[in-house]
């Protein structure tokens, strides 16, 4: 679901059965990913490099993250990532354990 149109994903390290998967994302202006809920015992961490992204957790908590902001949450919570602006956003995301 996170490979929707308008999102470019680049792995930052070769995937070799690591416990953590870091990648760089570029999200087009106005793009919104489908809401997902991953298996229990998973975590995600986001750090915004440029632009603004919006992360909604469990439909009732919305966080607007700008350059230099970070967020960490359990992937078992329903979550959605969006770029609500007219500018491209870039950010680093880490997932543990990895899931592509």
Give, region by region, the residue ranges found by the protein language model.
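A short glycine-rich, His/Asp/Glu-containing loop-to-beta-strand
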Residues: 1-36, 43, 94-99
């Amino acid at each position: 679901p996170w490979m929707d149109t308008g999102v470019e994903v680049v792995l930052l390290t070769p995937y070799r059965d690591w416990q953590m998967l870091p990648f760089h994302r570029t999200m087009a202006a106005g793009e919104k990913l489908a809401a997902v809920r991953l298996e229990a015992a998973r975590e995600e961490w986001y750090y915004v490099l440029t632009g603004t992204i919006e992360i909604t957790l469990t439909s009732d908590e919305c966080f607007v993250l700008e350059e230099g902001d970070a967020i960490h949450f359990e992937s078992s919570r329903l979550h959605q990532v969006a770029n609500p602006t007219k500018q491209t956003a870039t950010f680093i995301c880490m997932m543990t354990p990895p899931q592509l």
